[in-house]
């Protein structure tokens, strides 16, 4: 058989998926208030753990065609492209996070995004397991975040 059911995360690579970080999120953050930015590769795992995501592997659902107002023929946001552009630092991540109301970010520890957030005074690192980092977006009165 090629199908192996998941039993107690036995077949889930902790080097690829945020297994420990997901547990930490569920124990330390209010999921009802969480507006989490995550990278594309592991969004489905977060969703599997019951954590609301910015994007997961169902990329078509994050295209403008599926996020607009079809009744009024208004195209939606291109969340898929925004997610990739944020991860690749092709856009100003802070502007996009404000636009989407993001208050927390999870990213690979060695990613460009994690490196930039670690040095950005608007963000505070609140978790690091050596594979993933989680940042909190610090709201300031001056910018009305």
PLM regions and their residue ranges:
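Extracytoplasmic
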Residues: 2-145
């Amino acid at each position: 058989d090629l199908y192996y059911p998941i039993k107690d995360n036995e077949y889930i690579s902790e080097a690829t998926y945020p297994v420990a970080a997901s547990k930490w999120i569920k124990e330390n953050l209010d999921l009802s208030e969480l507006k989490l930015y995550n990278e594309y590769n592991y969004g489905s795992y977060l969703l599997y753990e019951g954590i609301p995501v910015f994007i997961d592997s169902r990329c078509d659902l994050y295209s403008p065609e599926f996020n607009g107002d079809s009744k009024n023929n208004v195209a939606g946001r291109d969340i898929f492209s925004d997610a990739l552009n944020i991860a690749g630092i092709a856009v100003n991540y802070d502007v996009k996070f404000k636009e989407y109301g993001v208050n927390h970010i999870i990213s690979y520890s060695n990613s460009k995004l994690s490196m930039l957030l670690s040095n950005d005074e608007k963000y505070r690192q609140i978790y690091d397991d050596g594979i993933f980092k989680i940042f909190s977006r610090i709201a300031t009165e001056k910018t009305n975040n």
